[in-house]
Swiss-Prot record:
Residues recorded with modification Lysine amide: K11
Membrane spanning residue stretches: none
Coiled-coil region: none
Similarity comment: family membership: Belongs to the frog skin active peptide (FSAP) family. Hyposin subfamily.
GO cellular component, one term: extracellular region
Protein name, UniProt field: Hyposin-H1
Expression sites (tissue/organ): Expressed by the skin glands.
Keyword Secreted listed: yes
Signal peptide limits: none
Cellular localisation: Secreted
Keyword Secreted: yes
Key words of the record: Amidation, Secreted
Organism: Pithecopus azureus (Orange-legged monkey tree frog)
Amino acid sequence: LRPAVIRPKGK
């Protein structure tokens, strides 16, 4: 899983 998945920008 990519690190971006841990902090999703899509609220």
